[in-house]
Swiss-Prot record:
The gene is rnhB. InterPro entries: RNase_HII, RNase_HII/HIII, RNase_HII/HIII_dom, RNaseH-like_sf, RNaseH_sf. Its cofactor is Mn(2+); Mg(2+). This is Ribonuclease HII. It holds the Pfam family RNase_HII. It comes from Rhodopseudomonas palustris (strain BisA53). Endonuclease that specifically degrades the RNA of RNA-DNA hybrids. It is found in: Cytoplasm. Residues 71-259 form the RNase H type-2 domain. Manganese or magnesium. Binds 1 divalent metal ion per monomer in the absence of substrate. May bind a second metal ion after substrate binding. HAMAP family: RNase_HII_B. One of its GO terms (cellular component) is cytoplasm. One of its GO terms (molecular function) is RNA-DNA hybrid ribonuclease activity. A divalent metal cation binds at D77, E78, D168. It catalyses: Endonucleolytic cleavage to 5'-phosphomonoester.
Length: 278
């Protein structure tokens, strides 16, 4: 039976180092496995105090498991918890240790152009799966449970069941194998970083398609987030079937455009499925 992995949530050594040593030297020389670089051995002037050199995500956790014969190892992340419209999109990725795309990082640190390029590289070299939690599921389960459900579904949809899973954040997901929750994992674990890119690009592309279905809301620009342009459209046009009606700005728009109907309106069915590729 599926079970939850160990109850403890890992605090990565990188984050512990950053918490315990808030000021660090940055410069040339061998890089510490975590987020702190050692003081330069050269005579070059040190950088200003308070600067922390942040290393890119690494493959060391996955490689350690691979050396123990534990493989495949999947990284999981989601995109779209905060928007007022559209689904939460979750991705699970198993990187090929011999064909890891260069430049993988937390999707939030990358430009849209770089994310798109890496998305194509990941799809061409890795196994992955994408799952969607629709606004209907978010309304039924709440945003956290819907997100965890989508993450678990993405893992289940992988072409080959993983033997270990790393998931971004504090919350583990229910899997048939061990699962480690890694706080800040999209900036620390390479497989999670890859999953963050897949989830982000998949969701952005979906929101651009929804913009064609719902003109006037600007979904292709803000991707459903509560920016002034979106709030103005909600106030002017009212909510669509893609909006999350329990989120406060959407609820206010419901009450303005259809008083009394928000609680009785039937939630639309799940409009999104899942996809996977080896």
């Amino acid at each position: 039976m599926p079970h939850r992995a160990r109850d403890t949530v890992l605090e990565p050594p990188e984050l512990r180092a950053r918490r315990e040593f808030p000021v660090a030297w940055a410069g040339a020389g061998p890089q510490h496995p975590g987020m702190i670089r050692k003081a330069p051995k050269s005579d070059a002037a040190p950088p200003a105090k308070g600067v922390i050199a942040v290393a890119p995500p690494s493959f060391r956790r996955e490689r350690a498991l691979l050396k123990r014969g534990i493989w495949p190892v999947a990284g999981c992340d989601e995109a779209g918890r905060g928007p007022l419209a559209g689904p939460v999109v979750a991705a699970a990725v198993v990187l090929d240790p011999k064909r890891i795309p260069k430049g993988l990082d937390d999707s939030k640190k990358l430009t849209a152009e770089k994310r798109e390029a890496l998305f194509e590289e990941i799809c061409a070299t890795a196994s992955f799966a994408v799952a969607y939690a629709s606004p209907a599921r978010i309304e039924r389960d709440n945003i956290l449970r819907a997100s965890l459900w989508a993450l678990a579904r993405a893992v289940q949809a992988l072409p080959e069941p993983p033997k270990h899973v790393f998931v971004d954040g504090r919350d583990k997901i229910i899997t048939p194998c061990d699962c480690d929750a890694v706080i800040g994992g999209d900036a620390l674990v390479l497989s999670i970083a890859a999953a963050s890119i897949i989830a982000k690009v998949a969701r952005d592309r979906l929101m651009c398609r929804l913009a064609e279905d719902c003109p006037g809301y600007g979904f292709d620009h803000h991707k459903g987030y509560g920016v002034p342009e979106h709030l103005a459209a909600l106030d002017r046009l009212g909510p669509t079937k893609h909006h999350r009606k329990l989120f406060a700005p959407v609820a206010a728009a419901w009450d303005k455009h259809a008083p009394g109907e928000r609680e009785t309106a039937a939630a639309p069915p799940d409009l999104f499925g899942l996809s996977a590729s080896a």
